[in-house]
Regions:
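Ankyrin-repeat-protein effector appendages
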Residues: 1-7, 157, 224, 257, ...
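Start-of-repeat signature of ankyrin repeats
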Residues: 36, 69, 102, 135, ...
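Ankyrin repeat boundary/linker residues
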Residues: 31-33, 66, 99, 132, ...
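Intrinsically disordered, low-complexity regulatory segments in ankyrin-centric signaling systems
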Residues: 1-41, 45-46, 53, 57, ...
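Core solenoid repeat modules with strong leucine/isoleucine-rich periodicity
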Residues: 133-136, 141-145, 165-169, 173-178, ...
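Ankyrin repeat A-helix N-terminal signature
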Residues: 7-12, 42-48, 75-81, 108-114, ...
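Ankyrin-repeat inter-repeat connecting loop/turn
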Residues: 27-29, 62, 95, 128, ...
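Ankyrin repeat structural motif
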Residues: 13-21, 48-56, 81-89, 114-122, ...
């Protein structure tokens, strides 16, 4: 068998392998190579329908398994060979078999962006509601890696636009992370709930949007009832997330719709402005200041926005804060007396 494995696996010499088999070479369907892989899997990988047919005709198991539980049909889905997938199914391969991660051939096809294969498997009756480990369905993979047309196809076939995994993370959250307004709009129109929170940390879809999305998506979520002041288990609000990611567009929309400028996260007591200064986020700081954020708010260690910017070495941010009225006192000391950054220290010491 090793000679056949070498021809198929290593040299891709399918014609010679077929010639050997037709000449009476003794096949051992249960034989596995050093990768614990049967010859049938290598035939699928090489996309040779003729060799697959020959091997199945010689007794190879269409539902053979790799060490991770994957089947030949999953391999066909991964390698996007519809003719082989069709042949395997005609020979009673299990359509919804799953590997040790709970993946089916359908999930595999979507995950590898083979959406023609995905449609083929759905038309053959693949279960679009099957769940992998942690509760992911094929719709999650289509939302993450596909187009609106792929997502629409699955929803039209019965996939739940409000689908969520075991931690209550929804497909809508993944669509928001992609920053795709049309996909977000479509899912909402088809029933996605903008108010769902994850069970693990009480995160909401607007919090995702505040980090990754544009103003159009943020506005769309707010229009459909998303809470601009949702607080997760870390005390983070959407505006705090916008501050940590320097997302000015999202922050502008959140503030216009009533986001709390002085909300504080739980661990360090940061407000959006404190967090932005701590992380040196230059774009969002002017917006927060212009909208009235407290320039002299203090975190749990008593540091102000200016103190945080000084500690992190953000000279331009320090200049901006001072020019807009940030206090120079830290308790009984002047911030210039405690700052370590030389450029900032010089700038502060030269102030009138």
């Amino acid at each position: 068998m090793e000679e056949l494995f070498r021809l198929v696996r290593d040299e891709n010499d399918i014609d010679k392998a077929l010639s050997m088999i037709r000449s009476g070479y003794m096949l051992e369907p249960s034989y596995k190579d050093q990768y614990n892989c049967s010859l049938l899997f290598h035939a699928v990988y090489r996309k040779s329908l003729e060799l697959v047919k020959t091997l199945v005709g010689k007794g190879f198991d269409v539902d053979d398994r790799l060490p991770d539980g994957a089947t030949p049909l999953m391999s066909a889905a991964k390698n996007n060979v519809i003719d082989i997938a069709e042949y395997l199914l005609e020979n009673r391969a299990e359509l919804d078999a799953c590997d040790e991660e709970g993946w089916t051939a359908l999930m595999t096809s979507a995950s590898f962006k083979h959406f023609d294969m995905m449609r083929f498997l759905v038309e053959k009756g693949a279960n679009i509601h099957a769940r992998a480990n942690w509760g992911y369905t094929v719709l999650f993979y289509a939302v993450i890696k596909g187009s609106l047309a792929d997502v629409r196809y699955l929803v039209d076939k019965g996939a739940d636009a409000n689908d969520k995994n075991d931690g209550d993370r929804t497909v809508l959250m993944d669509a928001v992370t992609r920053n795709d307004p049309e996909m977000v709009r479509f899912l909402i129109e088809r029933g996605a709930d903008v108010k769902i929170r994850t069970t693990e940390n009480n995160c909401c879809v607007l919090g995702e949007a505040a980090r990754w999305a544009n103003a159009e998506i943020v506005q769309l979520l707010i229009e459909h009832g998303a809470d601009v002041n949702n607080v997760d288990t870390m005390g983070m609000t959407p505006l705090l997330y916008a501050a940590t990611h320097d997302n000015v567009e999202a922050a502008q929309m959140l503030i216009e719709n009533g986001a709390n400028l002085e909300a504080r996260e739980r661990y360090k007591g940061f407000t959006p402005l404190l967090y932005a200064c701590h992380l040196l986020k230059p774009k969002i700081i002017p917006l927060l200041v212009e909208k009235g954020a407290d320039l002299n708010a203090k975190d749990k260690k008593g540091k102000t926005p200016l103190g945080n910017a000084c500690k992190k070495g953000g000279l331009e941010i320090v200049k901006y804060l001072v020019e807009h009225g940030a206090g120079l006192q830290v308790g009984k000391k002047n911030v210039a007396d405690v700052v370590k950054d030389k450029a900032i220290k010089q700038y502060l010491s030269e102030l009138p």
